[in-house]
UniProtKB/Swiss-Prot annotation:
GO terms for cellular component: ribonucleoprotein complex; ribosome. GO terms for biological process: translation. GO terms for molecular function: rRNA binding; structural constituent of ribosome. PROSITE patterns: RIBOSOMAL_L9 (PS00651). Belongs to the bacterial ribosomal protein bL9 family. It comes from the Bacteria. InterPro entries: Ribosomal_bL9 (IPR000244), Ribosomal_bL9/RNase_H1_N (IPR009027), Ribosomal_bL9_bac/chp (IPR020594), Ribosomal_bL9_C (IPR020069), Ribosomal_bL9_C_sf (IPR036791), Ribosomal_bL9_N (IPR020070), Ribosomal_bL9_N_sf (IPR036935). Keywords: Ribonucleoprotein, Ribosomal protein, RNA-binding, rRNA-binding. It comes from Prochlorococcus marinus (strain MIT 9313). Binds to the 23S rRNA. The gene is rplI. This is Large ribosomal subunit protein bL9.
Length: 152
């Protein structure tokens, strides 16, 4: 049975673990790949103490980010309705469609806060009217906004 060595990861390693994880790996894998490329360090009491401090700091940082997302969610709900103006033809059919970029621009205009368009899930919109749109603000925080599509 082969001996395994314990290392602490300095960064996320695919199929092995995340930054700060204590993992057991084959000695050759540690010696030839993880340690030389700075992806891990051998386990010592000092390293374990550092990992504890780093995890506490990361937890604080994540809590602050989540609180910021919750505050932004409250702001979105308070505003309530966002409007996107699009050119229409007969029977209020849009020329083109409403994209997540259009919604992001409407949110940025109303809130003065930048949001990544990739975090907005827009249903297929081809007519004027009112629609529900999902906005992902954080891994654990989502907001549902009302989008009003009007013609100009």
């Amino acid at each position: 049975m082969a001996k395994r060595v314990q290392v602490v990861l300095n960064e996320d390693v695919l199929s092995l673990g995340k930054d700060g994880d204590l993992v057991e790996v084959a000695p050759g894998y540690a010696r030839n790949f993880l340690l030389p490329f700075g992806k891990a360090v051998p386990v010592t009491p000092a390293v374990m103490k550092q990992v504890g401090h780093r995890r506490a700091k990361q937890a604080e940082h994540q809590a602050a980010i989540k609180q910021e997302a919750l505050d932004f969610q409250t702001a979105l709900v308070t505003i309530g309705r966002f409007t996107v103006k699009k050119q229409t033809g007969e029977d209020d059919v849009l020329f083109g469609t409403v994209t997540n970029g259009d919604v992001a621009e409407a949110i940025e205009t109303a809130t003065k806060k930048e949001i990544d368009r990739r975090n907005i899930i827009v249903p297929e919109i081809h007519r004027t009217g009112s629609y529900k749109v999902q906005v992902k603000l954080h891994n654990e925080v989502n907001a549902e906004i009302n989008l009003e599509v009007v013609s100009y």
